[in-house]
UniProtKB/Swiss-Prot annotation:
Participates actively in the response to hyperosmotic and heat shock by preventing the aggregation of stress-denatured proteins, in association with DnaK and GrpE. It is the nucleotide exchange factor for DnaK and may function as a thermosensor. Unfolded proteins bind initially to DnaJ; upon interaction with the DnaJ-bound protein, DnaK hydrolyzes its bound ATP, resulting in the formation of a stable complex. GrpE releases ADP from DnaK; ATP binding to DnaK triggers the release of the substrate protein, thus completing the reaction cycle. It comes from the Bacteria. Belongs to the GrpE family. CDD domains: GrpE. The keyword Cytoplasm applies. One of its GO terms (biological process) is protein folding. It comes from Brucella melitensis biotype 1 (strain ATCC 23456 / CCUG 17765 / NCTC 10094 / 16M). The lineage of its organism: Bacteria, Pseudomonadati, Pseudomonadota, Alphaproteobacteria, Hyphomicrobiales. This is Protein GrpE. The gene is grpE. Gene3D superfamilies: 3.90.20.20, Head domain of nucleotide exchange factor GrpE.
Length: 226
């Protein structure tokens, strides 16, 4: 009895008697609790690892998605640029397809005009057949130029305009103090454009000795003060 009185009410597991059924049950329960705790910790660690792995996969997928979006946007932009470039090339091909042909036809027109100008006026008055022939050639010239105009070929009318090397070719200078310097005063050979391109520059004579036009404000200054 003295031994039982000396036993503590809640003895430690190390002090349990394995041969005592009650102690053996307590030890078993403690072992089960320990295993459950370890399993719970392992499950929590595994779940945390799965969460981290899932988060990493999501981050990778988001990065891939962003890259694919960027690639798709770049492809779309390239396709749009290609579409515009193709459309522009088609428009240019349509507009300028007859460039070489038109240039050759202008040479023919020039020859017709030279032939007409070479016929003396008195010869036309004296010979009705020659006059009829001349009128036929002139009608042919006009019809040719009208046909070219319908296909986008336009005649340049530079007389009285300021000389522009992009559209005009200066052949000579004419002293004229009354006109601003470099004003087109005479057209030797007509120029032509097709679309926004020069098909053939106009050959012109320009004034010299007149007031210059200021590039800043458009005001005229005298040749001596320039």
């Amino acid at each position: 009895m003295a031994d039982e009185k000396n036993k503590p009410e809640n003895p430690d597991l190390d002090q349990r008697d394995i041969n005592n059924p009650r102690d053996r049950e307590a030890l078993k329960q403690a072992a089960d609790d320990f295993l459950k705790a370890r399993r719970a910790e392992a499950a929590a660690d595994e779940a945390e690892g799965e969460v981290d792995e899932t988060a990493n996969r999501i981050a990778v997928l988001e990065a891939d998605n962003t890259e694919l979006k960027d690639q798709m946007l770049r492809v779309a932009a390239e396709m749009e640029n290609l579409r515009k470039r193709t459309q522009r090339d088609v428009q240019d091909a349509r507009a300028y397809a007859i460039t070489n042909f038109a240039r050759d036809m202008l040479s023919v027109s020039d020859n017709l005009r030279r032939a007409l100008d070479a016929i003396p006026a008195d010869a036309l008055e004296a010979d009705s057949n020659l006059k009829s022939l001349s009128e036929g050639v002139e009608m042919t010239e006009r019809a040719m130029l009208l046909a070219l105009e319908r296909h986008g070929v336009k005649k340049l009318e530079p007389e009285g305009q300021k000389f522009d090397p992009n559209f005009h070719q200066a052949m000579f200078e004419v002293p004229n103090p009354d006109l601003p310097n470099n004003t087109v005063v005479q057209v030797v050979q007509a120029g032509y454009a097709i679309g926004d391109r020069v098909l053939r520059p106009a050959m012109v004579g320009v004034s010299k000795g007149g007031p210059k036009v200021s590039a800043e404000n458009g005001a005229s200054t005298s040749e001596d003060n320039a």
